[in-house]
Amino acid sequence: LEKEDITGNVCYDNLNHANMTRNRAQKIQKLQDIIPDLAVQGKSDTLVLGWGSTRGSILTAVDILKDRGVEVATCHLHHMNPFPKNLGDVLRAHKQVIIPEINTGQLRLLIRSEFLVDAIGINNLAGRSFFVKELADEIEAAMKGGAK
């Protein structure tokens, strides 16, 4: 079931459905023109990329790492579909990308498939936010090549 292109009438035509699906995808992609560029905080070869409720935990963990003398860059996604235009450039500007998530790593899978970046996931399945010291320890371990 689809609306007919131009008239908006109900239409069951396969070709019309394909056309309308492409139209919707193009409209979504055009949103990239108004989505602000992704802002990166800090300078480092390692980027910690977050989204959603991980923001506070990531920022606090990064502060803990700075106190330890470990430099980490961070940024936070506010838009997922489409991604900000500069996301690919931001990812490629860092040798290592770490993505803490309170799930099984769906964003990491999207980043890996869309941008071919071998991002490292830190996944929390405890049903609560990250403990910031624990997250800082896991980020530092990932930076050294080992997962905790």
Where are these regions (language model features)?
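Flexible, low-complexity linker and terminal segments
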Residues: 1-148
